[in-house]
Each structure stands twice: as structure tokens, then as C-alpha cells.
């Protein structure tokens, strides 16, 4: 490397001025959040243009023991139509020229439902969770703001709805019979019933919780109906003597 590159004139000429300084942004068309199929090649390997294209924006994390990126995130990347997408490590170092002050970096944000691969820990970085494949062709990590990254993680970490268990008629009959005997069966009774109807004990426990809630609602509604009926009977009984008096007066008027 020529020594003239380290001269004071070259260093000062390469430094951007405050007025002309432009914040570095990721290329919009050259760096979408889609990785072509590498076929075993390293993402940061020397072959091809991958290292030169992404090296400035996605520094190479080193896993414990000297393992590179393929060993760290190779198992976390998902394949879809010859594309790999997974956990993207976006460098959030302070940007902007030194003379104007740097923008504070993003804190370490990580989706709690996605395991962190080795080599991806550390402050000053944001871990973007896997996103649906429908969004990949239209996304660019370099253009996402701090709020958008947080919303993306929240969208991915949204709790999925559990599958509802469908019970057969025989299972429902056995569960209902035990419920009529006792509203709060112990663990041994639940396990015995679970083996009998070919269910897990957790499913039986959840069914009893839901059945008790339904039973309490029915009991509450029936008590309210009985109270309303009593109130109606009282009002009707109070009104009946008055009606009799009115009927008697009407009879006397008709006789006269």
C-alpha cells in the first residue's frame, strides 16, 4: 500500500465536511433482506462479490471456538424458493460525521421467542427476527427506522393462537360423568381418566377448568333468573288486591 495514502492531505481530503456530510445508508436495490442460495458458501467468504457487497453493513460475527457465521446461523436460516432468510444482524453503530455528533445507536433488541445464535450477542446491535416470506422482496434493512424495527419484532413475536382440541363423543361423555361426581378431581384421578380416554393429563385439566367456568356462569344466570321471577311474583301479588278493588267498584257501578 503506498505511503502517500496516509499523508495528512489525503486524510483531510477524505474527511467529509459538516455541511456536505451525508449519513451513510445501505444501498436500496443492492441489499434487500434476501440472501440468494449460497450452496454451502460462506456469507462472508472470499469467493464472489458477497463479501465486498455486505461487509460494510453486516460485520462478520465470530462464534465461540472460532466458528464462523455458517456454524452460527446456518441452522436458523430458513429456505424458501432458493432464498435464505433468518436472523439478520444489523450493525447499529453511531452514524454521522464526528464533528457534528453521532446519532445514539440502537440498543440490543431481540425477539424473546427466537433463540440467539452464538456470536450475535453484544451491545450496539439489533437482531431482526425472521419475517414472512411475502415481505422479503419489499424490505430493506437500511431504510427501516428504529420504530419500524421494533414493530417488526413485535409483529413476529405476537403470540400465536393455540389449536383447539376436538373431543370425541366418548371422551366428552367420560369427562362429563367425572365432572358430575366431582368438580375438582385430583391429579391421580385426572391421569386415570386421561389414560382411559387416550388424552393427556394437561388436556383433561384444561377441560375441567373450562367446564367449571361454564358451570359457574350457568349457576349465576339461573340465580339471576330466580331472583327476577321472585321480584315479578311480588309485584304481581301487590297489584292483585288493587285490581280486585277496582273490579268490585266497577261491578257496583254497573248494578246501580
UniProtKB/Swiss-Prot annotation:
Q: Keywords assigned by UniProt?
A: Developmental protein, DNA-binding, Homeobox, Nucleus
Gene Ontology MF, one = RNA polymerase II cis-regulatory region sequence-specific DNA binding
Q: Which GO terms describe its cellular component?
A: nucleoplasm; transcription regulator complex
Function of this protein? Regulates chordin (CHRD). May play a role in spatial programing within discrete embryonic fields or lineage compartments during organogenesis. In concert with NKX3-2, plays a role in defining the structural components of the middle ear; required for the development of the entire tympanic ring. Goosecoid-expressing regions of the gastrulating mouse egg cylinder have organizer-like activity when transplanted into Xenopus embryos. Probably involved in the regulatory networks that define neural crest cell fate specification and determine mesoderm cell lineages in mammals.
Q: Report if keyword Nucleus is assigned.
A: yes
Pfam families annotated for this entry? Homeodomain
List where Basic and acidic residues composition bias occurs.
240-256
Where is the DNA-binding region?
Answer: 160-219
Q: What are the recorded Gene Ontology BP terms?
A: anatomical structure morphogenesis; dorsal/ventral neural tube patterning; ear development; embryonic skeletal system morphogenesis; forebrain development; middle ear morphogenesis; muscle organ morphogenesis; negative regulation of transcription by RNA polymerase II
Question: Which Gene3D superfamilies has this protein been placed in?
Answer: Homeodomain-like
The identity of this protein, by name, is Homeobox protein goosecoid
The record's subcellular locations are: Nucleus
Q: Which domain of life is it from?
A: Eukaryota
Stated family: Belongs to the paired homeobox family. Bicoid subfamily.
Region described as Disordered: 213-256
Query: What is known about the tissue distribution of this protein?
Result: In early gastrulation, expressed in the dorsal lip. In later stages of development found in head, limbs and body wall. In the embryo, expressed in the postotic cranial neural crest cells, the frontonasal prominence, the first branchial arch and cleft, and specific regions of large joints.
- What induces or represses its expression, per the UniProt entry? By activin.
Q: What is its main location?
A: nucleus
Amino acid at each position: 500500500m503506498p505511503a502517500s495514502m496516509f499523508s495528512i492531505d489525503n486524510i483531510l481530503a477524505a474527511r467529509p465536511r459538516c455541511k456536505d456530510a451525508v449519513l451513510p445508508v445501505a444501498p436500496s436495490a443492492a441489499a434487500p433482506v434476501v440472501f440468494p442460495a449460497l450452496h454451502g458458501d460462506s456469507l462472508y467468504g472470499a469467493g464472489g462479490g458477497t463479501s465486498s457487497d455486505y461487509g460494510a453493513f453486516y460485520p462478520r460475527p465470530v462464534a465461540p471456538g472460532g466458528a464462523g457465521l455458517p456454524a452460527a446461523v446456518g441452522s436458523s436460516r430458513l429456505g424458501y424458493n432458493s432464498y435464505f432468510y433468518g436472523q439478520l444482524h444489523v450493525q447499529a453503530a453511531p452514524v454521522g460525521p464526528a464533528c457534528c455528533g453521532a446519532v445514539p445507536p440502537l440498543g440490543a433488541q431481540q425477539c424473546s421467542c427466537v433463540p440467539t445464535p452464538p456470536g450475535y450477542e453484544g451491545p450496539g446491535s439489533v437482531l431482526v427476527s425472521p419475517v414472512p416470506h411475502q415481505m422479503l422482496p419489499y424490505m430493506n434493512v437500511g431504510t427501516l427506522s428504529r420504530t419500524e424495527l421494533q414493530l417488526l419484532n413485535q409483529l413476529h413475536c405476537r403470540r400465536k393462537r393455540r389449536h383447539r382440541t376436538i373431543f370425541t363423543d366418548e371422551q366428552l361423555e367420560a369427562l362429563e360423568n367425572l365432572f358430575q361426581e366431582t368438580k375438582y378431581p385430583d391429579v391421580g384421578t385426572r391421569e386415570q381418566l386421561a389414560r382411559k380416554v387416550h388424552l393427556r393429563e394437561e388436556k383433561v385439566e384444561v377441560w375441567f377448568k373450562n367446564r367449571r367456568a361454564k358451570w359457574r356462569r350457568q349457576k349465576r344466570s339461573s340465580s339471576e333468573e330466580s331472583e327476577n321471577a321472585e321480584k315479578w311474583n311480588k309485584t304481581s301479588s301487590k297489584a292483585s288486591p288493587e285490581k280486585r278493588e277496582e273490579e268490585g267498584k266497577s261491578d257496583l257501578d254497573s248494578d246501580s
